[in-house]
Amino acid sequence: NQAKVIARLEGIVAQQSRQVEQAAYRRHQSLDKQFHRTFFDYSGNARLVRAYDDNIVLWDTHIAIYFKDYRSIWTRTVEQHRQILSAYQAGDYQMAQELMAAHFLEAVIPLKELLSQEDAAPAAD
């Protein structure tokens, strides 16, 4: 039920905050996945869950390469999770959905920038 989901999400966000303070990268990533998966599972949207499952290995690789040493990004992630959860708790599901979409899109920006730089670099002889 919704109260259980909210309690679980609150617990995950609280744990994430502690992991950022302790610079516990692997635990933070595990909690990040738990946060997203909890929302997706509760949505009842099988297509969304399948898309998440189909792309999680690629996503984990992306995160490991581009975000591992970026503690400020971890802090931003926790803040975004708080905002998503707050909107959800307030019953503003449209806002929660928009915040979740923005959260995912923002995470892709460093990868796009890196790929653009590689495309613009002159080829080595």
Model-based region annotation:
Residues 2-66, 79-87, 95-106:
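Conserved amphipathic alpha-helical segments that form helical-bundle/coiled-coil interaction surfaces
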Residues 69-73:
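Solvent-exposed loop and edge beta-strand segments that line ligand/cofactor-binding
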Residues 93-125:
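C-terminal effector-binding regulatory domain of bacterial HTH transcription factors
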